[in-house]
Amino acid sequence: MLVGKNITLRLININDLDFLFSVENNIKNFQFSDNPKFYSKEELTDFINNSSNDITTYNQLRFVIEYKKNQIGFIDLFDYDSINKKAGIGIIIDEEFQNKNYGSESLDILIKYSFKELDLLSLYANIDPSNFKSISLFEKHGFLNKEKLLYILKKWD
């Protein structure tokens, strides 16, 4: 569990199934998704059951973002590359909790965890050019636009 001032990041578990189902299948979220598709509860149950607290097992970690013990979003590390010490990072916050600094705090916590605890050297985010909220969030945290959809943060930046 990673604890910030207002929010907590914890690894996903089966109790998060209904929230995961609602977020993954919210058509509003498809607009900026790399993989817009509907998931069944069975598929998501398998995902949760096969998740690990060790990033090296499946090359990813999914954290639930909690505010006052309520689920408000997810933040992920994915495509973990142990050789080059890098990973992708993605975040989604429930619409009701956007623009309240929870995404920023979550990103800050996971960046610090990634560089200090996982010893990563860089993080990247694939962001749709029309997703101005995400672009602003990631740039605020030092990510630089390197290509059309790619934003990168290096440990020494």
What are the residue ranges of the model-derived segments?
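Acyl-donor (CoA/ACP) binding surface of acyl/acetyltransferases
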Residues: M1-L17, N26, E66-D157
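Short acidic-aromatic low-complexity motifs
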Residues: N15-D18, T56-Y58
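Alpha-helical elements of Rossmann-like donor-binding domains used by nucleotide-donor carbohydrate transfer enzymes
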Residues: F19, E43-D46, N50, E105, ...
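Conserved catalytic core of Hanks-type protein kinase domains
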Residues: S22-V23
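Conserved GNAT-fold acetyl-CoA-binding loop/helix
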Residues: K28-N50
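Sparse recognition of residues in long alpha-helices and their boundaries
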Residues: P36-K37, Q60, K154
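Short, intrinsically disordered/low-complexity patches at protein termini
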Residues: E42-T45, N53-T56, E96, L123, ...
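A short helix-loop-beta-strand connector motif used in the catalytic cores of GNAT acetyltransferases and
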Residues: S51-V64
